[in-house]
Amino acid sequence: MSVSIILMGLFVGALVGLTGVGGAALLTPLLIVLGINPSIAVGTDLVYNSITKLFGVASHWRQKTINFKLVKYLAIGSIPSASLAIGILHLFPAFHQHQEEIIKHALGYVLTLVAISIIVRLFLDRKLRPNRWQLMPLENKRALTILIGVVFGFIVGLTSIGSGSLFAIAMIYLFNMKASQIVGTDIAHAFLLVTAAGILNASFGSVDYMLAANLLLGSIPGVLIGSHLSPRFSPRPLQFIMASIILVSGLKLI
């Protein structure tokens, strides 16, 4: 048992509970700063995220705020794409020999993208008006939805980051859904995606189970504490601060 890792999990969990900002964008760069190899950081974070998102799925299932058809179309694209990204890194010698460097630089670019997406989401929540994409039925957007899954799934498979934030921004813009449905659908799809990617990483030996367990010991109470305190704080300033921190982390890794 590592007290420092548990405390880090508590810190990240509390921030997630307070702001709703994805834990992977905060946790993965922190693990790398602590000296964890990027490939292990990514694999461990995927497993950790799978377990934490399971609780979210159970809650939204009870609330009936999951659009299962949308989850299906996103997963059709994202899970094979994430598997492809992981396979490329581990099965092709040219990539496997340089995977730590590839993952580190990819993390930098994706963290920057995630930070921008969080800021854009703050803007869209206030300013976005109904557009022609939102007015289309889901069946008419099936190919586009699967394509979004392919693109963002590859990113998640490579870096563990974006299973929530990147897909959420796409759902806000493309689908006319209540905020609770966006969150529930996003978490349900993210659970399937990170679980599949986590299992595949585990098969390649890229998961530190003790590290994941210590993180969970801290993050679960952290999320509960953050969620309890969140009504006392305005979420937008906190989310903007977190986006700024993620942006700086990303730029340092590029």
Curated annotation (Swiss-Prot):
Predominant location category: membrane
Keyword ATP-binding: no
GO cellular component labels: plasma membrane
Subcellular location: Cell membrane
Record's bilayer topology term: Multi-pass membrane protein
TM spans (from-to): 5-25, 75-95, 105-125, 143-163, 187-207, 209-229
UniProt KW keywords: Cell membrane, Membrane, Transmembrane, Transmembrane helix, Transport
PANTHER family noted in UniProt: MEMBRANE TRANSPORTER PROTEIN MJ0441-RELATED, MEMBRANE TRANSPORTER PROTEIN YJNA-RELATED
Family assignment from sequence similarity: Belongs to the 4-toluene sulfonate uptake permease (TSUP) (TC 2.A.102) family.
Official protein name in the record: Probable membrane transporter protein YjnA
Gene: yjnA
